[in-house]
Structures are given as structure tokens and as C-alpha cells.
């Protein structure tokens, strides 16, 4: 386990750096087509005739909270100090935020369809964090999804999480 922690920390650091660096994450860039291993849903996101999709207050509030939860968890995740129980609790919090977001968000149908792709990746990342062999990958997927959300949805003052 001691050998694994530095490897996981390095992997997370590299992934987070690429997810937060401008232009470093081609798989979630609005101009990118296809699938590059970060999750098919993110690769399928499209812009609204070259513009970001609209958001509403419920969406912005929910995504801001998801970002805050991830930001608060990054130090321990990056340090390899998150336990299985903590990852499960983090996954629960992601799912709870998604539940509230879905319940209260009211977007036009086309924007809602795009949001469902983002939600699918958030839930997939949360599920990955529950598995013994996918926790760090789940956290990385969530970080990349937050980055993609900002690329495709009009959310004033949206900033991706920096590591």
C-alpha cells in the first residue's frame, strides 16, 4: 500500500493539472470530437450553435456545491489519505447534490439533454469512488466533469477546481 500511495498521488496530480490547465484537456474541449478515454458522455457534449447552454439558479447552486465539496476533499485525496468510507461518503454527497439539482433545475429541453450527460458522468464518478479499484479514477472523472461543465454551460464566475 505504501508504494501505491505515491503512484496514486502522482496520477491524481497529473490528471488534476490537466483538467484545470487551459487547453490541456482536449477530450472535454468544446471543439473536440470523439472519445478520448474520459467518459463517452463528456465527449458527446455539444455547444448550442457555438454558445454555452443556459443555466438556471438551481443548476448553478447545485454545481457550485458539487465543486465546493470536491475542492474541500482534494487535499486528502491528493495525499492518498482518503479512506474507503470517506470516498463512499463523498459519493453519497455527490449523489445527494445531483438529486436536488434534478429535482429543482428547469432548463429548456435541449439544454436539459446536455445536462443529463454531465449528470451521468457525475454519477458514474461517484459510483467509481465506491469501488476498491476505482476510487482515484472516480475523483479524476468528477474533476474532469466539472471542467467540462464550465466549457459547455453558461455559469457566471465558474472556475474549475485547482489542485
Per-range role (PLM):
Residues 70, 85-103:
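Short N-proximal segments of mature Sec-exported proteins
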Residues 10-19:
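Bacterial N-terminal signal peptides
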Residues 27-82, 161:
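Immediate post-signal-peptide N-terminus of mature secreted/exported proteins
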Residues 97-116:
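Short, solvent-exposed, charged loop/turn and helix-capping segments
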Residues 55-62, 66, 83, 87-90, ...:
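Amphipathic alpha-helix face/heptad-repeat signature
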Residues 2-11:
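Bacterial N-terminal signal peptides that target proteins for export
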Amino acid at each position: 500500500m505504501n508504494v501505491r500511495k505515491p503512484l496514486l498521488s502522482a496520477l491524481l496530480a497529473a490528471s488534476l493539472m490537466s483538467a484545470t490547465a487551459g487547453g490541456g484537456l482536449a477530450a472535454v474541449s468544446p471543439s473536440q470530437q470523439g472519445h478520448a478515454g474520459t467518459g463517452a458522455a463528456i465527449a458527446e457534449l455539444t455547444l448550442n450553435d457555438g454558445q454555452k447552454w443556459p443555466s438556471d439558479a438551481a443548476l448553478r447552486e447545485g454545481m457550485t456545491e458539487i465543486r465546493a465539496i470536491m475542492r474541500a476533499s482534494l487535499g486528502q485525496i491528493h495525499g492518498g489519505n482518503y479512506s474507503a468510507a470517506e470516498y463512499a461518503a463523498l459519493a453519497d454527497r455527490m449523489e445527494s447534490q445531483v438529486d436536488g439539482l434534478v429535482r429543482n433545475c428547469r432548463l429548456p429541453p435541449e439544454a436539459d439533454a446536455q445536462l443529463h450527460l454531465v449528470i451521468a458522468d457525475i454519477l458514474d464518478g461517484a459510483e467509481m469512488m465506491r469501488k476498491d479499484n476505482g476510487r482515484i479514477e472516480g475523483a479524476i472523472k468528477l474533476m474532469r466533469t466539472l471542467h467540462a461543465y464550465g466549457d459547455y454551460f453558461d455559469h457566471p464566475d465558474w472556475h474549475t477546481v485547482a489542485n
